[in-house]
């Protein structure tokens, strides 16, 4: 009886330890949703160049309260999930953040969401229109992210983007 009780306690403790040590950050999703096809920045730039899709880049820190608050809203949004198929999705956490100042156009606050054209160039004109004007790339809700994704789609895909892009090269 005591051997059975000891085994049950050990099994229960192991299960409890497994549950409490998991923070939902498996894979490249890092809490933003493993159902989304995330890439590294390097792989994402290659894929965007080959596919012609724009990139959406999330920059966040594991210790950041605002980042932790955005994660479940982002991960649970079916609209973000659906729109993500029209982007190369890149998720950068902690030391993965690029040192290039293009990735912090108005400061190094977090989280930041930036949109890049298919050539890998940050497009600073795509901002959170309904957010704080001092923090243009800071999103606090799934609705704001969806709005940004839709704006990026309009500006970075299709004929409007190609016309503008080719004019810039001339």
Swiss-Prot record:
A motif (Prevents secretion from ER) lies at residues 167-170. This is Thioredoxin domain-containing protein 12. GO terms for molecular function: protein-disulfide reductase (glutathione) activity; protein-disulfide reductase activity. It holds the Pfam family Thioredoxin_7. Keywords: Disulfide bond, Endoplasmic reticulum, Glycoprotein, Oxidoreductase, Redox-active center, Signal. The keyword Glycoprotein applies. It is an enzyme of class 1 (oxidoreductase). The gene is Txndc12. One of its GO terms (cellular component) is endoplasmic reticulum lumen.
């Amino acid at each position: 009886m005591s051997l059975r009780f000891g085994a049950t306690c050990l099994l229960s403790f192991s299960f409890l330890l497994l549950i409490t040590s998991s923070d939902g950050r498996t894979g490249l999703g890092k809490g933003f949703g493993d159902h989304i096809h995330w890439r590294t920045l390097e792989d994402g730039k290659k894929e965007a160049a080959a596919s012609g899709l724009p990139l959406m880049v999330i920059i966040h820190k594991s210790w950041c309260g605002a980042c932790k608050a955005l994660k479940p809203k982002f991960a649970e949004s079916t609209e973000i999930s659906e729109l993500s198929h029209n982007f190369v999705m890149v998720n950068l956490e902690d030391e993965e953040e690029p040192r290039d100042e293009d990735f912090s156009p108005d400061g190094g606050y977090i989280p930041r969401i930036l949109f890049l054209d298919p050539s890998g160039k940050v497009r600073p004109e795509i901002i959170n229109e309904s957010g704080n004007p001092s923090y243009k790339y800071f999103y606090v809700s799934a609705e704001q992210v969806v709005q940004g994704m839709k704006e990026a789609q309009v500006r970075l895909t299709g004929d409007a983007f190609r016309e503008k892009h080719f004019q810039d090269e001339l």
